[in-house]
Amino acid sequence: AQDVIANGGTPEIGDLATPTNSSPFTRTFINALPIYRRGLSSNRRGLEIGMAHGFLLYGPLSILGPLRNTETAGSAGLLATVGLVVILTVCLSLYGNAGSGPSAAESTVTTPNPPQELFTKEGWSEFTSGFILGGLGGAFFAFYLASTPYVQPLVKIAAGVWSVH
């Protein structure tokens, strides 16, 4: 019988090759994410990740926020999203400037070639700059989409699902 779990490199860091993390599907999916995709600059990585965060945070913060059944729910959701993106950017900046900067990425079973240029102080600073720009852009784009007449009925349906009437 063949072992299902194999040693994937250094067992001290818990790098085991399981059928889940070493399958071709998982490796392709993880390596297609902006943080690990080849050929992207640090700024572009931050821009893509920030856009996703800003866009996806807007919905829950506007529909589930304390002003969800008011006329200002969209604006409140936008301001909450902008505030959260700014807080996340400050945290990323603190992480990049603490000590000697971000630690170098190690290759694992799932990510055999992590981007080394991202894990320098300069690279992390570019990533953080792209993150805030993308996060704010994603939040404003989601706000714009949610306020269009085509999406507004869907927003009202979603807001009604979680309301307490």
Curated annotation (Swiss-Prot):
GO BP annotation list: photosynthesis
Pfam families reported in the protein's UniProt record: PsaL (PF02605)
Membrane topology: Multi-pass membrane protein
Primary residence: membrane
Gene Ontology cellular component terms for the protein in this record: photosystem I reaction center; plasma membrane-derived thylakoid membrane
Domain of life: Bacteria
Cell compartments where the protein resides: Cellular thylakoid membrane
Keyword vocabulary terms for this entry: Membrane, Photosynthesis, Photosystem I, Thylakoid, Transmembrane, Transmembrane helix
Residue spans crossing the bilayer: 49-67, 74-96, 127-146
Family to which this protein belongs: Belongs to the PsaL family.
Full protein name: Photosystem I reaction center subunit XI
Organism (species): Synechococcus sp. (strain ATCC 27144 / PCC 6301 / SAUG 1402/1)
